[in-house]
Amino acid sequence: MKFGKLLKRQIEQSLPEWRDKFVSYKELKRIVASISGSPADEAAFVAALAADIDKIDSFFLEQEEEFVIRHRELQEAIKKAAEAAAEVAGIRREIVDFHGEMVLLLSYSSINYIGVGKILKKHDKRTGGALAAPVAEAVRERRHFFKTETVSRMVRECEAMMAEAAVLPAEAAPEALAAAAEHGIFRNTVAALLTMEDVRRGSSTHGRHSLPPLTLPDSDWLRSFQPPSPIPIQ
């Protein structure tokens, strides 16, 4: 499947409020196709690409900052609910949702990263230019959405939270996780991961100056739930 269709699928699997924050792949492709060699055409492409990268980076940073706060709040909530069985179910759902949203953000980072690389490759192929190398270097050095260590760490810590006896009692854990997995965010998270596997299998952008791959979570627990198709998140 072509990248444009996989990107469309990934956007559909994302949260509604995220869907206008992805790389404008179709529009950037149109701009590349219209480049005639004039400085004005090149400037228009560079401006459009820079605006898109700024959009992606700002959104990623905003979400990361929000997730850091939510992560801290959940840790506090777990401590308070350790002796209140009635609160455990609600916190369990919050943890599963939060975990899913963070994985969706990692997928968001990765697919936009690949999209930028593909657009740069198309640009250089059409113009004979060499824009990919400096842009890739700038992204690696200065852009937040390339640096996913904080979110990846919180994903791992969130999985540890789900394993804590105070939040997931051993006798109730399987049923609790199964119930939580029916929730839209969780199911769409797994579907998004499967889409990213398709994207990586079909990607041909790797090269000396291409954007290096990002790491997505490789969780046996998460991948044990593989729904046949995503469900809409209203």
UniProtKB/Swiss-Prot annotation:
Disulfide cysteine pairs (residue numbers): none
Superkingdom of the source species: Eukaryota
InterPro entries per record: SPX_dom (IPR004331), SPX_prot (IPR031142)
Protein name: SPX domain-containing protein 6
Purpose: May be involved in maintaining cellular Pi homeostasis when plants are exposed to an external change in Pi.
GO biological process, one term: cellular response to phosphate starvation
Domain SPX, chain residue ranges per copy: 1-137
